[in-house]
Amino acid sequence: KDAVLKAAEDGAQMVLCTGGMSVDPDDRTPGAIRELGAKIITYGAPVLPGAMFLLAYYSPGNGIPDVPVMGLPGCVMYAERTVFDLILPRVLAKDKIDDIEDYGQGGLCLGCEICVFPECGFGK
């Protein structure tokens, strides 16, 4: 929680959190993001790999724009394509994301032998 606060208040345009994103009682990342007072857009996404993705917006105040805070599930470390590949370009374009449920159509990466992402059905 403190690290996210510091990053946002120091001017970070985005904060990525990894680890502790499951539903186990000792997974604390989602709770820490909630404690910030961040507006949780989603904790869970209809996308595989990446179902335990969290997206929130934290408002530091003092005229500082809302900071997107993403909780990234472990799959982003090993899977070739994940929910992060779908969401990151939109966050970088400052698109306020509120339509996560739309990823349910085409939300399964088939792990093709030869990956042609983004020229495939993943995330469409």
Question: What residues fall within each predicted segment?
Answer:
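Short glycine/threonine-rich loop/turn motifs
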Residues: 1-123
